[in-house]
Amino acid sequence: IIVVVNLINFDSIKKGEKMKLFENNLDTKIFALGGLGEVGKNMYCVMHGNEIIIIDSGVLFPEDSLLGIDYVIPDFGFLKRNEDKIQGLFITHGHEDHIGSINFLLQSVNIPVIYAPNQAAKLIKKKLIDRNIKYDNIVIFDENTKVKFKNLEVEFISTTHSIPDSFAIVVNTPNG
């Protein structure tokens, strides 16, 4: 996964002018609910004010010592407690460590919309049909798509990966 957050353009600050780091006195928070220090279970959040976007919702395949366990999924507790702030789920590509827990997520948390590249969207739809989960709000994006919320704007950069239709996600916030 690649998350790119734009940096402050110091050239745009006039001489003698104080640099304003935080718009509206709100912090932008970027954190992982899975995927750090492990290969799998990728799930990241960007939060600004009352808006949260989620990036990926993957599974971790268990080690041999976890007998009887098929998948390890992220802890959705934070998302459940902040369900009203969720603007959408953004998928970078169709590997299971990035989409494998979507069916579990949708059964636990209200996700208003899933944004995914075409190939990943097809894989997600198949996964949901196989598990009898009805969900109709999957929006397909490409490198020309921009998604704008009140405080967050999301853009996409096509990347080369071992699966077609993979993207980096660019998140613009009032803080950069």
Set out the residue ranges of the language-model regions.
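A short catalytic or substrate-binding loop motif that flags glycine-/basic-rich loops and adjacent residues
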Residues: N24, L36-G40, T160-D165
